[in-house]
């Protein structure tokens, strides 16, 4: 037995695993427990009590309706949509122009180079029908913006030269790029000024006009996701803002201006409780003390749902701090769309009483609605933290109004642009009013027209504070897009109030009565799927854990500790029972003092034991439905035991808690997906026979389970060889599968090192499934090439290997989003994913002098440690050997003079195998000799004009697994994705975490043979005759095939003509499906031509069949010149001839994308060995005898001649999900 690199002498006694996994920040009170319990409560449970609590007397309802009607009539009467109201009315998100406007608003002034800026303008404007909007609004602002877009659209669109006007337009277009650029810039800045008060906090003079009318202000230095340096700078900005805001002293908290701060802008890791309380709390206290000194208000702004309770922890500490006593200026924003809203308000009022102060409570409808929906669906959580209907939020807004106005401990600040809500609050609060009792709030640039009817004598005489963003257009355009999204939605009040088709009666309807009249009070929106039913009736989505829930964390921590106390073992499991062997311990790679369990490895003399079992051991057997049911039962068992499995994965594989959860979920998804696919598509297919499954250590349960599940449900017996490093979780997976009904004869486990795998591959099995390195896959291919399956064909090999995965980022991309996606893609799982980002390609205009600065700053805040603590970001690499190989590469790069940036490692990492997140600047892509499997990101810069050359360089690596692109240019997306040769494409998002059935996973070239795991073709590779892929309107017959069939018909080759036509009707070339998935994404699955196919025919008829199969799938061919069949293809149609070449030297003429062989067993074996020896990608070889070709029209499976491509597009990248916002 080879030495185990994980085994080292014990140092000190290891601490008890998970003893400090997620200690509570503060003990939970009864009120805090109520908040936690309501986090994801079903809407049908939330709404009935809210409806009752919000129900008002008929007198108040009638008075509110009358006031709301007067407000709306006044608004509609004095103007028709001036400012932003008119803009969002004219350009709704249901129009192409509205979406283009949103995209334009976000990016142009941020783009540093004029070429990309001009390209964005052309991309977004040229196709819009801007002229149709001209003059439809009476607003000067709307028409000014429209005129600019009309002119720009004319200058950028394609023109017809036959008219004089077209020639003039073309002349202006050729000469006028600066004019176009300046016009769009002006239009976007004009829009920005509608929302942004000023560029600096000192620019407060714009506020004076409305202050004189009785308005007050709360200023917010809006900031994006920060690095540590950004957070420090933002803190200084907030300090300066407080000083500047307080200059006009003496007006007090309620009548003077205030400041809003965003906690996530002040700390780069505002989700990790321990760090936040230790590092952020002192900063916030310092700002609060400064605000207290000036006697102004300081509001803590809203965050995403998973940060709420952490924000409440900070608020509680601040309010109970003696240094801040006597100051009533602390404020907190509560979002009514959250199901916890009523309980948060109860907690804040109680906190005010306990601390002896008044706390300002800004009640808003909510700011992250679409993102919360998507997050819950992605994470497989029990329910949403927010309501799915906007009218439910309107109801949630009301119940605490009267109580809040009566309770002197709180100062309600009602932030709304809805006239009905405003009127209801006005009458519910009563006529007894004094300054400081309550106030209204609105957003700068949006609510002033409404509140001009509220503020001052002769109006409703209630105060309104304007929430006013401050900053440059460059920093605040994301905020602008968000406002356009929220208010451009057809369901928003701002949009509807300016729509003459919406009656005033509709606008003033009491939401409480509307909800009460619904068939089911609190029924969720029927167009928003709960996470569990994301895939409809086909299958249940796997469930995750909500790690922002204190109760969940507490129960998970207990389960992890119980898991650590279990005795984990792995034994060889044959059909006849467990086998003996040499036993060794398995150590935690993050802490070698922690003994996870023990494994008994398969002895050499028992390698042959499974062979006997193969002969008498059947597959899973039974009907398809029974086999699928076994997988479903296994999925349920795995789901129920997830906490226990997590503890084992974390300790054995060194995964973080989040990664371990994703691992188990993926395994469950594989089980359910293959069960569903079996029922739907497999039919009465014949299994291949015994399958050897060799799985990797980096996904020791998910890939292990996926391989086995697919092979078993197709009816094949399985010999499972887990990775040497992770046998324990594999053994537990086998126990679960057997408990679910898989017989021992159908599933055997053989733990051990590479020699066990080699012995299994050398056996007489019918197929091999392998995930691992390209080098090992080549060895397996060469070993299999020397023999044939019982049917006389090449032994099927499904290999999924590594990748030199790249991401291209152009200057139109949003830097903050890019940094987050890059860090996740490169360093999640310590870079030990085959999909991980290895090379970041930055356009030089955006990269600056040091392109890795932003990523480097962010990387410094990744915590590397043993992941038995929840806050760990980056765990260990798997073995000492892996660590040594990575460090050698880093040193080689240093030796070449490349710039290397690394974060330091904490001293406690010395007990494990850790490599710090590392960023290396390269001069060219060819500096990389091979894939570096660890937390190492390489960065190169490129010129915009060299984009095509860069894509060619990426393709030239020969790998083709994952690829990422960050750009706002649709034209660039279409161009790059059409040229890149990769199996999984990711647009404006990270490039990891493919979801089963949503982003089928697998590469091409050096990255694998296909078919894609978790995709519709996978099971077909495990039976003798694959089912025909789903037909779709996108599928088309290649016209070149039709030309070939016509040519064959002219030769009188009737059988071959029929074969060609049959191939055309069976081919799925061009298939383009949108797969089900979470909101905010489009997930496309397409089938393309595979490339150039090597044909090795023995007869003329065989050649015609091979060529027909290749052409039916859109491919070109290289025909073996040694076949001597050149005369058989004389006088081919030109279209066909362009696809055909002859090859005398396969090595020189390659690489090829596949091979079709004709011949007897001896010839097939000889050709197969020759192909296995070729350099380049792993080729999928299909072979058949001449007799079989004549008898069987499906002798060559067309599925293996097409290339599967999965593309995942973040449709919310521009700031939000337009389609989802429109339905709320």
Swiss-Prot record:
One of its GO terms (molecular function) is DNA-binding transcription factor activity. Residues 1-25 are annotated as: Disordered. The keyword Calcium does not apply. One of its GO terms (cellular component) is cytoplasmic side of plasma membrane. Residues 164-501 are annotated as: Proline dehydrogenase. Its EC number is 1.5.5.2, 1.2.1.88. Pfam families: Aldedh (PF00171), Pro_dh (PF01619), Pro_dh-DNA_bdg (PF14850), PRODH (PF18327). GO terms for biological process: proline biosynthetic process; proline catabolic process to glutamate. This is Bifunctional protein PutA. It comes from Rhizobium meliloti (Ensifer meliloti). The gene is putA.
